[in-house]
Amino acid sequence: MKVAITGKGGVGKTTLASTLARLYADEGRTVLAADVDPDANLGLALGLSEEEVNSIVPVSKMKQLAKERTGANDQNSFYKLNPDVSDLPDKLAKDIHGVKLLVMGTVDTGGTGCVCPDHVMLKAIMTNLVFRRDDVVIMDMEAGLEHLGRGTASMMDQFIVVIETGARSVQTYVRIKELARDIGITKVRVVANKIRDESDREFIRSRIPAEDMLGFISYSPTVIDADRKGLSPYDCSPDALDEIRAIKAAIDAKE
């Protein structure tokens, strides 16, 4: 199972990504959670301490490793565009509650289409992840599909957009669905978070096709409190855990 979770900052995609990862780990599955958001906080949501999270060097910052794998150096402008990185996900991952956390980071291309060694290695690792046939891979991504090439995207089982009740949030779903269609992906699912009442549900249902909906997560002060304290929502909110468990069942049913 390969799942990409995206959405604007603050909508709760990391809550969903971290809880799904731990639920799959509870089943004894090999789970690799990749944090591909520049505001990397998936580690905290999985249960790492702030000190542990701060000690992790994102893959995108491992410039020497990128040079070694691509063969790049100061004297040579040529390097491998498809380096062997098959050993890196397991070697670089941090284990937490049965989940292997891989903090990817991002490479700022400035809109130039950069193919620098850092970017090449990052792309190669992400491609490698989706070909790990028997593993569960969950990617926590910023609002877009820029990190996924057409080939990588075609291997994903689920694209999930996390939204809130609001026109701007719904527009994010519309934009990502258009981007997905451009690279050949026709199925984009939605999880609506921070739902307070039935009117919120009706707002979402009136704007999102029923076949795209995976489920709802209620507004939860305990989840917000867990975030403030740097704790895992999995450990703090039984209600949210039950709702995400139901969303997981819907994901598995669509596999």
Q: Which ranges hold each PLM region?
A:
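Hydrophobic anchor at the beta1->P-loop junction of P-loop NTPases
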Residues: 5
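Walker A (P-loop) phosphate-binding loop of P-loop NTPases
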Residues: 10
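Conserved lysine of the Walker
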Residues: 13
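Hydrophobic positions on the alpha1 helix immediately C-terminal to the Walker A/P-loop
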Residues: 16
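N-terminal phosphate/diphosphate-binding loop that engages ATP/GTP or pyrophosphate donors
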Residues: 23-97
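Switch II (G3) loop of P-loop NTPases
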Residues: 104-110, 114-115, 126-148
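Inter-motif core of Ras-like GTPase G domains
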Residues: 124-133, 148-167
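C-terminal lobe/tail of nucleotide-utilizing enzymes
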Residues: 179-255
